[in-house]
Amino acid sequence: MKKIYGQAYVNISRKNITLNLERVLKSKAAKKYFTPKRWVRKKYIVDNSLHSFLNAELSKQYPNLGNSLKIYYINQKCFNDDLKKEEELYGKAKDMLSHEAIILQRGLKDGTATHESLHCLGIPHSFSERNVLFFEIAFKRNYTDNIMDYSDMYGIPTIATWEFQWYAIQRFIHALHTGKW
């Protein structure tokens, strides 16, 4: 994460916090988010309710983290209830311009946390229509080394950001730190 943000001349400080959910997971309200094997149910990631649940639990234990990006690392697989099998989901930002992202087991050892945190800051996929709207440019999917592409799945490491992304990253980080977001 530091390498990618460093390209934009942004120094990030990370604070790792362990959110103990063992007691909470025994409640009926929490059980819906997980299978009996404790796999995360995809539908609750997609509809953002798991993000909201984790935020509520985090706020109970750490009430002063409002203006922070929160990356929830969950070392579990993702389960698709409709297909009754594992979903190959690495992670998901709650929304563009949000404060939270969830990173699942598949995304723990690659650039998923950085990719999703950049979505939280409003940085779209390099190949998307949103990228055209935001930056007036888009690139062919899976052909760049940009962290916001998916080319790492095809042998091209996603190790770079581009100068036009740097300014957006800097603006959003500044807004986050000054409480203007």
Where on the chain are the PLM-derived regions?
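Extracellular (secreted or membrane-anchored) zinc-dependent metallopeptidases
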Residues: 3-13, 18, 27-116, 120-181
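Low-complexity, acidic Ser/Thr/Pro-rich "mucin-like" tracts of secreted and single-pass surface proteins
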Residues: 20-22
